[in-house]
Structures are given as structure tokens and as C-alpha cells.
Amino acid sequence: MKMSGFSIEEKVHEFESKGFLEISNEIFLQEEENHSLLTQAQLDYYNLEDDAYGECRARSYSRYIKYVDSPDYILDNSNDYFQSKEYNYDDGGKVRQFNSINDSFLCNPLIQNIVRFDTEFAFKTNIIDKSKDLIIGLHQVRYKATKERPSFSSPIWLHKDDEPVVFLHLMNLSNTAIGGDNLIANSPREINQFISLKEPLETLVFGQKVFHAVTPLGTECSTEAFRDILLVTFSYKETK
């Protein structure tokens, strides 16, 4: 991926200093062909099945294993997802199982470039322990809201993630959607920043230095509104 005018080292320093980072979508859309690849990726969200663990959400999840002694990413047969109660007071403490992400989405060159970019960025930080085997998790999530039923994230309020580095890529947002904005806080009682991602592939990166939350998604229209995201998470492979 070409990164004209983008210094990854400077952005990593900014991220480590603040605990979060905004990344423009231009970094992912510099090639003309990426616009059509984005459209293909967006269409896949219409096929997501409902999230069994939360209303008004649809979701799929797959994960790669990156072993220390290999440059390759190996698609894991397991798509179990676990968060501790400490970090997710709504759904933590239990193993959640989601449908796997479609091969067409995983093999989309744009998505593959995004995962490579996220991995390179994460590896340049002083946060990731490069001596451990990594899990690179991909979460496709569609938040679906109607006039009577808003859609909530999990957990619904300020929290930190289990994973030391998390990328949030906005994939699509209907123009009838209200909310779905990101809050950044230095403590659970102090909201310091309000960030609205509006354009596809606008991105936020979170570490464990800050708390963050997503406001509920709603709409005033009679038709359903949606917000589609791709989370790319970095954590360590379970030891047995």
C-alpha cells in the first residue's frame, strides 16, 4: 500500500502519546481500483446474520494467527471470541461464537491491504509484544436502527478493550442514521473528545490508555438506518 504524505512513524508516536488516533480514509483509497473494491466489501454487510448476543446488530468474525517465526497469516479454524468481565461488563466472561466472515470479503485485496497496514502500524508501536504469537481478529458489524428500536454497541458505555491495539474502520453509514459517534475519555467521568466518522474507511485506533464508547444509533425515518464497521484487533494467542 502506497502511503504518500503519510509518515507511519509520526502517526505511531502520536498514537502512543494520546492513546488513540484518527486516520484519514485517503490512506486506503489512493488507488482508483480501491473504490470498486470498497463497494464490493460494503455489499457483503447486507448478508450478515443477526448477532445472537445483541439486538439490532448483525455480525461475523474470523481470526488469523501470526506466529513469531513466520511472516504469514494463518486463518484459524476457531472463531471463538472472549472478552473478560473487566473490559466488557455486558458480554464479558463468556465465549461468544459468531458466523465466519465470507471468503470473498477476506480475499478482497482492499481488505487484505487494510489488515497489512494495521499490522505494520501495530508492530511499529511499543505496545505489541513481538515475541508472542498473535491473534488478528476481524469483526464485521452492522448496527441496525429503526425509529422505535435504536442499536447499541457492546459494552454500551465507556470502556477499555481487552486487546492492546484495536482499529475501527467505518465501512458504510446510511444518510438517515443519527448517532453512532465515538467518545474518548481519560477516565469514566471525563469525556475529552467527540469524533464522528462519516465517510467510508475513516479510521480510529485505540489503545488501553483511554476509555471509549459509541453512542446509540437511531433514525427519524420509517426505513432502517445502518452503520457498518470493520474492527481489526490484535491480541495474544492463548497458551494451553
UniProtKB/Swiss-Prot annotation:
Give a Pfam family name.
Answer: 2OG-Fe_Oxy_2
Alphabetically sorted, this entry's keywords are: Dioxygenase, Iron, Metal-binding, Oxidoreductase, Vitamin C
Give cofactor(s), names only.
Answer: L-ascorbate; Fe(2+)
**Per the record, what are the reactions this protein catalyses?**
L-isoleucine + 2-oxoglutarate + O2 = (4S)-4-hydroxy-L-isoleucine + succinate + CO2
Q: What is its EC number?
A: 1.14.11.45
Highest taxon of the lineage: Bacteria
Q: What class of enzyme is it?
A: oxidoreductase
Q: How is it used?
A: 4-Hydroxyisoleucine is a natural nonproteinogenic amino acid that exhibits insulinotropic biological activity and increases glucose-induced release of insulin.
List the molecular function annotations (GO) for this entry: dioxygenase activity; ferrous iron binding; L-ascorbic acid binding
Q: How is the cofactor bound?
A: Binds 1 ascorbate molecule per subunit. Binds 1 Fe(2+) ion per subunit.
Q: Which residues bind Fe cation?
A: 159, 161, 212
Keyword Metal-binding in the entry? The reply is yes
- By its UniProt entry, which InterPro entries does this protein fall under? 2OG-Fe_dioxygenase
Per its database record, what is this protein's job?
Catalyzes the hydroxylation of L-isoleucine to produce (4S)-4-hydroxy-L-isoleucine. Can also catalyze the hydroxylation of L-leucine, L-norvaline, L-norleucine and L-allo-isoleucine, as well as the sulfoxidation of L-methionine, L-ethionine, S-methyl-L-cysteine, S-ethyl-L-cysteine, and S-allyl-L-cysteine.
- Record's family? Belongs to the iron/ascorbate-dependent oxidoreductase family.
> What's the protein here called?
L-isoleucine-4-hydroxylase
Q: Which gene encodes it?
A: ido
